[in-house]
């Protein structure tokens, strides 16, 4: 390992020490709880939408979440290890065949829906026990 990789690994371990980051990918609906500072007060705001892509790797990894707010599409890019992210929760898994879902920007209504990924029987039985 060279010096840069060593330093990045140390930073990655330090930043991800207190967090549990779930496994999620493009097509998954996620709720990202973001810390918002307004003046002297801070609060946690939930941002729910579809993950349309992940980019980068290691300490520089980020993901893009798209939601429809009052009929207008809103996208937000979050660094995965940002201290402003309180928590990430996966609401549902989407079945997609692409790594980047930028085509959703051009779709409206029912055509913009993503099919939910079905659990196989063995995983469902294991989860029930």
Swiss-Prot record:
A GO term from the CC aspect: cytosolic large ribosomal subunit
Family: Belongs to the bacterial ribosomal protein bL19 family.
Molecular function (Gene Ontology), one example: structural constituent of ribosome
Role summary: This protein is located at the 30S-50S ribosomal subunit interface and may play a role in the structure and function of the aminoacyl-tRNA binding site.
InterPro entries, A to Z: Ribosomal_bL19 (IPR001857), Ribosomal_bL19_CS (IPR018257), Ribosomal_bL19_sf (IPR038657), Translation_prot_SH3-like_sf (IPR008991)
Top-level taxon of origin: Bacteria
UniProt entry keywords in alphabetical sequence: Ribonucleoprotein, Ribosomal protein
Stated name of the protein: Large ribosomal subunit protein bL19
UniProt entry tagged with the keyword Ribonucleoprotein: yes
GO biological process: translation
Cysteines paired by S-S bonds: none
Entry-linked PANTHER family: LARGE RIBOSOMAL SUBUNIT PROTEIN BL19M (PTHR15680:SF9), RIBOSOMAL PROTEIN L19 (PTHR15680)
